[in-house]
């Protein structure tokens, strides 16, 4: 019974993702993810440089 339950859960998830993937929602979320990636990359690089220079113990 649990295998059938998991198969049904994955079917529902795949249908939802398929519906969202064939609309404009995926493109919008990809743009948001790209912007967040670059923001966190800049924050990481700033903290890395500060950690190697100013905040060295």
UniProtKB/Swiss-Prot annotation:
Membrane topology, as annotated: Multi-pass membrane protein
Family annotation (InterPro entries): DUF1328 (IPR009760)
Main location per the UniProt record: membrane
Subcellular localization: Cell membrane
Keywords: Cell membrane, Membrane, Transmembrane, Transmembrane helix
Keyword Transmembrane helix: yes
UniProt keyword annotation of Transcription present: no
Transmembrane domains' residue ranges: 6-26, 35-55
A Pfam family recorded for this sequence: DUF1328
Disulfide bonds: none
Cellular component aspect of the GO annotation: plasma membrane
Family label: Belongs to the UPF0391 family.
Protein's name according to its UniProt entry: UPF0391 membrane protein RPC_2356
Organism: Rhodopseudomonas palustris (strain BisB18)
Taxonomic path: Bacteria, Pseudomonadati, Pseudomonadota, Alphaproteobacteria, Hyphomicrobiales
